[in-house]
Amino acid sequence: KDGYYRVRTPEGYIAWVSESSITPKSATQLEAWQISSKVIVTADFGHAYTQPDEQSLRISDLVMGDILTMLDASNDFVHVSYPDGRIGYINSKLVLPFDKWLGTRRLTAENVIKTAETMMGLPYLWGGTSVKGVDCSGFTKTAFYMNGLVIPRDASQQVLAGQPIDILSGGTLDIKKAIQNLQPGDLLFFASGTDRPPTARVTHVALYLGNGEFIHAAGSVQINSLLPEASNYGALDTRTLIAARRYIGQDDSALQPLAEHPYYNTGKK
């Protein structure tokens, strides 16, 4: 409609996307793509080129998590195709075979936190889910995605998934209880303004690191603390914290392993 497609993303998000950003595929074409050999970009950032030579013309930029069809490979470059038919070459150091990469994903707090910390300092960008910039929920989504789990897109949706963790007493944040009950890898959820009730609309999310610290995209990706005595105490964030959820180890239809997701499943046994 008027130059836009109404689409549903892999996590179920419904939105409008410009026609120039989408290449429609038939069911047969999608199936062919699913069973094709693919690579995933594991480096933060890179480029594809018209020739197996980084001095040749660029086809496009690439960011961590991009998936492309692999045509063939040499020691130094991978020959790839794009959904819109473009052909390019990527330095092999930037990618891994998708099936191999997927087989090595281990959804642990340590791994999710490690991925999150590689994004330290990235600028905040509303709607962002890459090293070009991230918003708060795009940041947490990327940290889990690169470890094999598709989670809801927005903070207000992410707070509805996983196991609730008790961090409140009498409807307000209990720091002692929170520190006792939270585990690294849990998600913290915040409402706009101070002293909001637990039923307030969630507008921000962070990843808990342990020992009172959390990492989040707020201006830039940074680490703050729930503890008033800490040098990186996040006073405003702490006053607006209203909920916490645990994704790791939870069976929830809103949390979809990449290996089982119909959009990513290769169909190979």
Say what each PLM segment does:
Residues K1, R8-I40, D44, D53, ...:
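Boundary regions of SH3-family modules and the immediately adjacent low-complexity/disordered segments
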Residues Q29, E54-S56, T199-K269:
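Aromatic- and glycine-rich peptidoglycan recognition patches
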Residues G46-A48:
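Extended non-catalytic domains of envelope/secretory-pathway proteins
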Residues P52, M119-Y124, A143, N147-I151, ...:
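Sec/Tat-exported extracytoplasmic proteins
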Residues L62, L68, G185-L188:
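Generic structural signal for buried aliphatic residues
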Residues D99-G103, P123-V131, D195:
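Second-shell loop/turn segments in exported
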Residues A116, G128-N147:
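Active-site nucleophilic cysteine motif
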Residues P152-I223, E229, E260:
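...with weaker cross-activation on analogous glycine-rich loops/strands in unrelated enzymes
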